[in-house]
Amino acid sequence: MGSAYGSAAAIVAIMLVPVVSVVQGQEEARAVAGGGISVPGWAGKIDANEASRGQKLENAKLAKEGNALHVTTGPAVAYWNPANKATGNYTVKATFTEPKYMNLNDHPHPYGVFIAGNDMGTDQQSYLYCAAYGKGNFIVRGFGPAAFQMNGRGGEMNDAVHKAAGPGQPVTQEIALSVKGDNVECAINGKTVASYPKADLVTSGKLKSTDGIYGIRFGHNTEATVTGLTMTKQ
């Protein structure tokens, strides 16, 4: 009897392991006090999976502080000014400063720039983004309109990506996305960390074009400032 009970308990324990992991992995996005967009001319849209859980754009915050944009999330979100458009060959870059690494979460979350935005603000919006984490890795992902990944679920580690000294410490990343002929590249802190053929991006289920609106992208429960958001023609 004891042996049978032990076997049954072991089976139950094994069955529960993935369930517990899934529950622990579901970190809910917070609602930021005084949220919304207060920067004239700017717009935003949260991810569809965030909206399906009852989140709204007003639960994240985009504000202007001097020459910087100050973002606090909230649900994962993209922000843009519709006047910011890029066509042909170009580079979009910005500098992101997380003043207190992981101050709103117990693990790192990413932020970066996006390009090739089309149908922005609608359920059919598409764009590509490159984003960095303060632990030394980066991701290249997009929406077309369903989410897609270019370098895997966890992204890639790269020495070019700055690492915070620890929780509560500052970390800064300069992130750029470039369209150069038949390729699209992501550079972080001056080093190219990823390059993809344009044909692998402008295709069914991904981008409509590499021409389009550019802006900034933040994961949920993250806070950082953005400076020097610029587009340069190649």
Regions from the PLM with identified roles:
Residues M1-A10:
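Bacterial N-terminal signal peptides that target proteins for export
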Residues M15-Q24:
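C-terminal segment of classical bacterial N-terminal signal peptides
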Residues Q26-Q234:
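Extracellular glycan-recognition regions
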